[in-house]
Amino acid sequence: MVMHAPMLLTTTKINLTTYKLAPMEKIDNWMSPMSEEKLLQACARIKHVALDMDGTIYMGSTLFPYTHHFLDTLTQLGITYSFLTNNPTKSHKDYLIKLERLGIHATDEQMYTSSLATIDYIRLHYPQAKRLFTLGTPSMQQEFIKAGFELTTDDPNDRPDILVVAFDTTLTYNRLCRATWWASKLDIPYIATNPDWVCPTDQDVILVDCGSLCKAIEGACKRTPDIVIGKPNPNMLYCIRDMRGLDSNEIAMCGDRIYTDVATAQNAGSLGVLVLSGETTLETALASNPQPDITALNVDEFGKLLVKAHS
């Protein structure tokens, strides 16, 4: 877990020219490459906030102390919100239960996982596909079964229509080898649920995520996924945009990773908000190119900016 001093953005003295960036507007605990006027105009347009979860509103099983206040702020401003996660290890129902346990009530419509996005992608692009070989947890596999798919076994004669590789905390060596076998068959579409190398955790361990599993498969059979569904692919935000009848610039994507959360927003034409409560450090944020539209200490500091913009 990355720890930050309470006033990191305002008290840390950094020579931005070291990073060859244009000077950034500094407002309390926020930073932006935009002027304050343009920043507030962009925030004033926001009608919906898509929230990453791990590293953004909680870490592992611990809710950040400011999360409730931030969500209350959105409600008071009339801004709707949803939860997006690249972590496919749990079904969307499991995530709703976890949020409820943490004191956050959310509906089915507010939860969108990379598993659900993968299901939507397969239905759209491979409507005849029914049989899948998946690297994924039992909870994720149930999500696909409920959607009408059949999961193939670890048998070379049980040929799938599509290979789906996900973050799998129940991974066995045999199934990794079988997934690699199917990936070596170029006529079988190969889909990855998300690009993350590791999953954030508050435990003393590194959780190897989907991107790392795909790299292992690539090392063995020289094939990469045909498509990676989760963030930074903009499809998840496009679905939210279309379902809610919004324009892309009326949505903010808020998360702790530049290469997934912020990149998703930029790819979708939405406002990209980086929070420093998870994976990304201030130094990494300053060195990134392009810059996040907003870099905030945490979601509550972003909420204060929204209040200012909507007042």
Provide a role label for each language-model segment.
Residues 4, 8-53, 59-79, 88-112, ...:
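Asp-based, Mg2+/Mn2+-dependent phosphohydrolase catalytic module
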